[in-house]
Amino acid sequence: MKIYHLYRQQHLNMTLIDAWEFFSSPYHLNDITPDFFHVTITSNVPEKIYAGLMISYEMKAVGGIPMAWLSEISHCDEPRRFVYEQRIGPFKFWSHEVCLTQQQNGILLEDIMVYAMPLGWLGQLINSMLIASKLEHIFDTRRDYLQSKWKAEINASLM
């Protein structure tokens, strides 16, 4: 099984508390994802996330095909870090860690994604032909939105 990594970081001119409130709310997903994604939360989500919280979504990720996604907040260290992991969805494995670090003039946002594709070599081919570029597009859209809203400095890498 091939494991893929996607890492992004940005400096944002906002407070740690404001950053936590924004990034820990799944209701902001449509603000920071491309229009084609159409994320709809299908479960009740409390005001504050916590470890063990399960959140279900519907989205249109590839070719407008609707898909269900169930994620669990596996770790939550308010206001610095949370991790959500796919429990049901298109990936064999998906983990997205969001880290917020206070700095002199705002915060450092780090997105650390680790994922694996299903279907063995076919999944690897699909990743190289479609999924990796879609993920880049999703996080480019996120970067651009954040940059326009909070003057972000950008660093990205895909492994």
What role is predicted for each listed range?
Residues 86-137:
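Beta-strand/loop substructures that line and gate deep hydrophobic ligand-binding cavities in soluble
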Residues 7-13, 40, 58, 72, ...:
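Generic structural detector for well-ordered beta-strands
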Residues 15-16, 74-81, 99-108:
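A short, structured loop/turn motif at beta-sheet edges
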Residues 5-7, 66-70, 92-96:
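Short, surface-exposed coil-to-beta transition loops
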Residues 1-50:
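Hydrophobic ligand-binding cavity/cleft-lining segments
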Residues 12-14, 61-63, 75, 90, ...:
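Beta-strand elements of well-folded, non-transmembrane domains
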Residues 41-88, 141-149, 153-158:
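Glycine-rich portal/gate segments that line the openings of hydrophobic small-molecule binding cavities
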